[in-house]
């Protein structure tokens, strides 16, 4: 659910700090490039004031999608001849296109995770915005209100165990029975707001990430009172919300031994909350599992959690920036889970400076100097090899995790074509790593015809002797419209002997299956795509995640629900390979 300069989207993918920082010109209806600053308007004469009053159309014009700028020299864009480019728009009746895979089943979001209100005057919309912490709804364009409110119920990531699927949501978790994927059924919903709902499961334990300031220790839906609006002249100042003893930001742990009745057994607080987390199983430790916590949001007040500091390292060597957190979870006593270390994975080993890495300069930062990397967005582990790949905003990291409490950096890379290092996947043999770039934060249209195919793409690296070397890029080949948020996002390997194949979500770009066996020449072998949710305005939707599990592919559709797919034989993938 980082990082674009759009007037409409000054917000990280998953709200996180955005709920505190939310301004009227924030979300969902995206102006794709910053507009030139308008000239100061002259005061209209008295008889012109009525005519100057904005109409609903006028107030939304600022948020209308804009086409991409011309391609930079030497860059190529996406294919407008692909049939995915012109699919009909619609929420549940959009056009569809597929190759090498078929759609098996679809379930709409369960009731607790849907906001059916569409009118900005609906009391439920106002209530939801209040729970999100929106400071001053009166300044928000009226037609934008129900769309922003929908973000409180966005679907996010998946976890699997046995015949159960756990689908995270900004409002909690849905648990499904997938014993028969073609007849997937909802078992229960766990209402527990706080976003973004990144989930993982181990035995009878379910872990969920929470980073938004409306999260409560008791999973209550009432949130907290919005912060008072800033005083005149201080509108641009940003501060963490006032301390609340019942606020929760970190990793929740549930006992799901009774699958229809999950019980929270622990809630481990962290200074920046948990944007994502990664389950780490140590082959040499059967009594504990470990959670790597990636926090990308603001640092909370020390009055709310002792020891939290958002200062730069030069002012406070104990800053909560420039680190990850490690939680140790005793499997037999999860209520005793706690943070046991906060590794400084960005440190300069020569000088000891905590801010030892930077992005090297990025194409979307203009003339800005290289920015220090102070957070990881997501970490992928390969426990059998004792390695982890960290996608850490400005850098891709390779970590030694043989001692899971004290991971050590082996290598770090950056790339001027990358805006925000988002996630990573190892090849099955551990000789390649695929990193993703979430250019636009997942909230912008970044697969338009003139969007370069090296921006918002996968970067495929060789991994040799603990060093990463770039081999190539891969981006969804088909162009997408101005009203479809689209960029590289979450995926997983598909186990085909002798080949490296990954299924991957691209938000409203749909699902693309990539063969990267030859790391220098990746290519698409299957896809499924729907048309945009809306033909005229960019409404956040599409696949957050696409994962292969036991012969099926599951898609977590942000706005619509849950999809089930199967690969089909094609010139790229034989029946024997599918059955292997």
Where are these regions (language model features)?
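Bacterial N-terminal signal peptides that target proteins for export
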Residues: 2-15
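Residues at the start of alpha-helices and the adjacent loop-to-helix junctions
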Residues: 8-9, 22, 416
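Bacterial N-terminal signal peptides
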Residues: 12-25
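Feature marking well-ordered beta-strand scaffolds used for ligand recognition
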Residues: 31-580
């Amino acid at each position: 659910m980082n990082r674009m300069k759009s007037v409409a989207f000054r917000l990280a993918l998953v709200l996180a700090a955005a709920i505190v920082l939310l301004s009227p010109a924030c979300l969902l209806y995206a102006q794709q490039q910053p507009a030139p600053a308008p000239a100061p308007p002259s005061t209209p004469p008295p008889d012109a004031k009525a005519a100057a009053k904005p109409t609903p159309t006028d107030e939304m014009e600022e948020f209308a999608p804009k086409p991409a700028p011309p391609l930079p020299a030497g860059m190529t864009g996406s294919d407008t001849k692909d049939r995915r480019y012109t699919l009909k728009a619609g929420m549940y009746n959009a056009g569809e296109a597929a190759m090498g895979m078929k759609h098996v089943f679809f379930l709409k979001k369960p009731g607790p995770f849907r906001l059916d209100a569409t009118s900005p005057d609906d009391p439920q919309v106002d209530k939801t915005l209040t729970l999100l912490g929106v400071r001053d709804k009166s300044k928000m364009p009226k037609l934008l209100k129900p769309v922003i409110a929908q973000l409180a119920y966005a679907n996010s990531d998946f976890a699997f165990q046995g015949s159960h699927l756990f689908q995270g949501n900004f409002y909690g978790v849905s648990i499904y029975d997938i014993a028969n994927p073609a007849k997937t059924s909802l078992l229960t919903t766990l209402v527990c707001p706080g976003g973004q709902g990144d989930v993982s499961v181990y035995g009878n334990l379910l872990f969920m990430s929470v980073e938004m300031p409306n999260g409560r220790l008791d999973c209550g839906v009432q949130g907290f009172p919005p912060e008072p609006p800033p005083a005149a002249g201080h509108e641009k100042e940003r501060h963490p919300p006032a301390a609340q003893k019942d606020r929760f930001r970190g990793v929740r742990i549930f006992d799901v031994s009774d699958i229809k009745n999950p019980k929270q057994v622990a809630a481990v607080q962290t200074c920046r909350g948990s944007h994502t987390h990664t389950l780490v199983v140590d082959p040499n430790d059967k009594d504990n599992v470990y959670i790597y916590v990636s926090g990308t949001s603001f640092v909370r007040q020390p009055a709310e959690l002792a020891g939290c500091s958002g200062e730069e390292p030069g002012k406070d060597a104990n800053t909560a920036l420039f680190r990850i957190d490690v939680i140790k979870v005793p499997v037999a006593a999860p209520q005793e889970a706690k943070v046991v270390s906060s590794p400084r994975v960005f440190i300069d080993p020569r000088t000891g400076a905590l801010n030892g890495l930077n992005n090297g300069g990025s194409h979307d930062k203009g003339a800005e100097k290289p920015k220090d990397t102070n957070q990881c967005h997501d970490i992928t582990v390969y426990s059998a090899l004792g390695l982890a790949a960290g996608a850490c905003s400005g850098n891709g990291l390779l970590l030694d995790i043989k001692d899971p409490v004290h991971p050590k950096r082996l290598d770090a890379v950056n790339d001027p074509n990358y805006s925000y290092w988002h996630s990573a996947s190892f090849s099955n043999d551990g000789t390649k790593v695929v990193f993703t770039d979430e250019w636009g934060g997942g909230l912008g249209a970044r697969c338009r015809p003139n969007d370069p195919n090296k921006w918002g793409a996968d970067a495929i690296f060789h991994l040799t002797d603990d060093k990463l070397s770039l081999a190539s890029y891969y981006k969804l080949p088909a162009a997408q419209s101005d009203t479809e948020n689209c960029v590289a996002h979450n995926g997983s390997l598909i186990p085909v002997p002798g080949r490296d194949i990954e299924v991957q979500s691209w938000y409203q770009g749909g699902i693309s299956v990539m063969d990267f066996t030859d790391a220098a020449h990746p290519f698409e072998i299957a896809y499924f795509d729907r048309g945009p949710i809306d033909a005229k305005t960019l409404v956040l939707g599409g696949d957050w995640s696409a994962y292969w599990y036991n012969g099926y592919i599951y898609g977590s559709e942000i706005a619509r629900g849950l999809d089930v797919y199967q690969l089909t034989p094609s010139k790229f993938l034989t029946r024997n390979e599918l059955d292997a």
